[in-house]
Amino acid sequence: MNTTPRIGLGVDVHPIQPGRPCRLLGLLFDDADGCAGHSDGDVGAHALCDAVLSAAGLGDVGAVFGVDDPRWAGVSGADMLRHVADLTARHGFRVGNAAVQVIGNRPKVGPRRAEAQRVLSELLGAPVSVAATTTDGLGLTGRGEGLAAIATALVVPTG
């Protein structure tokens, strides 16, 4: 039996949609516009989903949730993470730990970092660290046109 831990990487980018609620890292931010998308536009949760799925060899968010499947329309990033954690467990892995970095100007993640880490860790059943950065005015995130996130995850075989 293979007992080697596996590492995955996930990236997500969405454009800002003025007036849409901002859901990020499993939290609601009242002081910023949210991202457009088939689901809730939570780039942090989506990047984490991709990282876990890729580590477990289960594809990516598009393969699991689709981009136009009505069953997943408007689904929260939190529900997506729950589903990914369950799917990963059914395929013989558990999340060991994960990290996610949000790239954008707003919302400010720092003041709610501990809350986001707690929520995401509960959803995945493993420690999740959260970081944020800007691009110093460069690109779509720097101009405030979108948000991006990159994540890594370690999964461990349970067998």
UniProtKB/Swiss-Prot annotation:
Its pathway is: Isoprenoid biosynthesis; isopentenyl diphosphate biosynthesis via DXP pathway; isopentenyl diphosphate from 1-deoxy-D-xylulose 5-phosphate: step 4/6
Which chain positions carry the site (Transition state stabilizer)? 38, 134
- Broadest EC class? lyase
> Where along the chain is 4-CDP-2-C-methyl-D-erythritol 2-phosphate bound?
12-14, 38-39, 60-62, 133-136, 143
- Which UniProt key words apply to this protein? Isoprene biosynthesis, Lyase, Metal-binding
- BP-aspect Gene Ontology terms: isopentenyl diphosphate biosynthetic process, methylerythritol 4-phosphate pathway; terpenoid biosynthetic process
Binding of a divalent metal cation: at which residues? 12, 14, 46
EC numbers on record: 4.6.1.12
Instruction: Name the Pfam families for this protein.
Output: YgbB
For this protein, what reaction is catalysed? 4-CDP-2-C-methyl-D-erythritol 2-phosphate = 2-C-methyl-D-erythritol 2,4-cyclic diphosphate + CMP
Name the needed cofactors. Answer: a divalent metal cation
Q: Cofactor stoichiometry and binding?
A: Binds 1 divalent metal cation per subunit.
Annotated TM spans: none
Which GO MF terms does the UniProt record name?
2-C-methyl-D-erythritol 2,4-cyclodiphosphate synthase activity; metal ion binding
What role does it play? Involved in the biosynthesis of isopentenyl diphosphate (IPP) and dimethylallyl diphosphate (DMAPP), two major building blocks of isoprenoid compounds. Catalyzes the conversion of 4-diphosphocytidyl-2-C-methyl-D-erythritol 2-phosphate (CDP-ME2P) to 2-C-methyl-D-erythritol 2,4-cyclodiphosphate (ME-CPP) with a corresponding release of cytidine 5-monophosphate (CMP).
> Which family does the record assign?
Belongs to the IspF family.
State whether it acts alone or in a complex, and with which partners, per the record.
Answer: Homotrimer.
What name does this protein carry?
2-C-methyl-D-erythritol 2,4-cyclodiphosphate synthase
**UniProt source species:** Mycolicibacterium paratuberculosis (strain ATCC BAA-968 / K-10) (Mycobacterium paratuberculosis)
